[in-house]
């Protein structure tokens, strides 16, 4: 009869791994990770089966996982949807830089799709490395709601909206509403009373907040506004510009809009290209305001008036909130500021 230790038998001369436990319990390795890290979204019977397999195999968590208990791994998990858009990438870069400056190593996991399954998979991935805290960049409202449903056993900071069902969730963002309001206030101060609002996709929280604030400010100033939808791309801005020009050519019954507020700089770039191709002068014929202050916005033709997001301040606030959560303290979470940058794409409307 063999007297081989079960851990050696399972591992064939090596310590048993997480996958060995998964095979013995007939579950996925992600489920084993959730049990090890006290993730609540595991059925009791499944949890018992995994714990039994751990005991039978003599499985021991590796050093990285054990640091979760002592909170000394120096790792902060960061989850984001894979995107090359300016806002999400700038947010990610700011968080990574702030983490490094404070002696932490950011561990990034990108979502393959915007779904609960993909979010859980990403959470499992970073938990396996023994993170101390988790930062989720929730660009879409649905991702904020899904994050609220998770209780991974470590502090969670959401960069994005605060879901109504999770008032206890720490959330941070750039003040999108203040930025959009500043853009419309600028146009109102120049004397514009007919403004087109080129909004981003409405499943993005930033796009919703910018549009809502812009519409409210237009109403406050008695500005007549028209909403068009884009998809953040310069191509959608160009298409919107072409559509506006076609509308103006077909409808001579009323005054034309004198300004456009685009919800990001890429769409503003597309607008400028469409107007230039049609011989419409900016800002003599129409003013254009963007949002983001992307690299090169001051080299657009003409240089773009836009809203600058303070991502450095956002990254600092995320780290402050994370460190406070790790210390069991609360911190006053205020939106990072947004700043109006006035350049040459805006001017008073023609009389």
Which residues does each predicted region cover?
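Alpha-helical recognition/docking segments in bacterial nutrient-uptake
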Residues: 1-6, 13, 75-185, 189, ...
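N-terminal helix-turn-helix DNA-binding module of bacterial transcription factors
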Residues: 1-73, 350
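Periplasmic-binding protein-like
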Residues: 78, 130-138, 196-199, 227-228, ...
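Flexible loop/turn connectors
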Residues: 11, 246-351
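Hydrophobic alpha-helical segments within soluble ligand-binding/sensing domains
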Residues: 170-197, 234-246, 268, 309-327
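Short, solvent-exposed amphipathic alpha-helices that sit
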Residues: 49, 87-101, 179-183, 205-224, ...
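An alpha-beta-alpha
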Residues: 181-221, 227, 332-347
């Amino acid at each position: 009869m063999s007297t081989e230790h079960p851990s050696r038998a399972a591992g064939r001369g090596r310590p048993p791994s997480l996958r060995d436990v998964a095979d013995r319990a007939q579950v996925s390795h992600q489920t084993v990770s959730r049990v090890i890290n006290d993730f609540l979204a595991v059925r009791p019977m499944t949890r018992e089966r995994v714990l039994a397999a751990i005991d039978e195999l003599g499985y021991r968590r590796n050093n990285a996982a054990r640091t979760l208990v002592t909170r000394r791994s120096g790792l902060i998990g960061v989850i984001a949807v894979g995107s090359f858009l300016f806002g999400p990438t700038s947010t990610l870069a700011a968080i990574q830089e702030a983490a490094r400056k404070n002696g932490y190593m950011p561990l990034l996991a990108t979502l393959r799709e915007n779904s609960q399954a993909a979010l859980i998979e990403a959470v499992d991935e970073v938990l396996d490395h023994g993170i101390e805290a988790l930062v989720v960049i929730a660009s879409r409202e649905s991702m904020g709601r899904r994050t609220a449903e998770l209780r991974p056993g470590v502090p969670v900071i959401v960069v994005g909206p605060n879901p109504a069902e999770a008032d206890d969730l720490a959330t941070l963002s750039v003040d999108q509403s203040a930025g959009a309001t500043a853009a419309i206030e600028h146009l109102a101060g120049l004397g514009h009373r007919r403004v087109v609002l080129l909004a981003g996709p409405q499943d993005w929280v930033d796009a919703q907040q910018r549009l809502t604030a812009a519409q409210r400010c237009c109403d406050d100033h008695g500005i007549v506004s028209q909403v068009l939808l884009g998809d953040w791309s310069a191509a959608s801005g160009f298409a919107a510009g072409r559509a506006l020009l076609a509308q103006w050519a077909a409808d001579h019954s009323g005054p034309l809009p004198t300004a456009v507020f685009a919800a990001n700089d890429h769409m503003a770039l597309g607008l400028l290209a469409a107007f230039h191709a049609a011989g419409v002068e900016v800002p003599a014929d129409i003013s254009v305001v963007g949002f983001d202050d992307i690299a090169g916005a001051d080299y657009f033709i003409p240089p773009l008036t836009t809203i600058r997001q303070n991502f450095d301040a956002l990254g600092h606030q995320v780290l402050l909130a994370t460190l406070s959560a790790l210390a069991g303290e609360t911190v006053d979470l205020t939106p990072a500021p947004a700043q109006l940058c006035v350049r040459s794409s805006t001017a008073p409307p023609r009389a």
